[in-house]
Amino acid sequence: MRILSLLLLTIFIGTSCSSQKTSDMTSTQMEYSAVSRGLYKLVIVQNKTVSVTNGKNTQPVVTNLSDAKWKEIVAEFSKINLESIPTLKGPTEKRFYDGAAIGNLKIVKNQKIYETPGFDNGYPPKEIEKLVNLLVDFTKE
């Protein structure tokens, strides 16, 4: 009887923790922007939807994400240490001489904002590269 109750308790706690993580992601907002004199791209992902703006005077296009794409984004997001985001450094510095647009990743989780310093669009810091590339892919669709 003890083993059965212990097993049920373990399953209950495990299920509770996984549903908590899922609800955390529904309130998390990821925003990627790339800006230069002639370029403006903004991608906002939140709660299985993506909003893409390609141009300063254009309306955003909002679409729903497939479950597979959402799980891919959540998997990459979970690998990131949010506290280290403000200290990340891009591998190149082309943005200083107009060689690349300025890229920026901003994450809002539990009403706290985590934002990278500017980096070259197309050359994100290695720690966030896969997530940024997933977000940039939405501007190509």
Describe the role of every protein-language-model region.
Residues R37-D67:
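Post-signal-peptide N-terminal segment of Sec-exported extracytoplasmic proteins
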Residues G14-S16:
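C-terminal motif of bacterial Sec signal peptides marking the signal peptidase cleavage site
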Residues P60-K89:
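Mature extracytoplasmic domains of secretory-pathway proteins
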Residues M1-L7:
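Sec-dependent signal peptide recognition
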Residues N47-V52, T63, K71, L82-E83, ...:
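Short, low-complexity, polar/charged sequence segments that are solvent-exposed and flexible
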Residues S5, S18-A34, V74-E76, T87-E141:
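Short, well-ordered, aromatic-rich surface patches in folded extracellular/luminal domains
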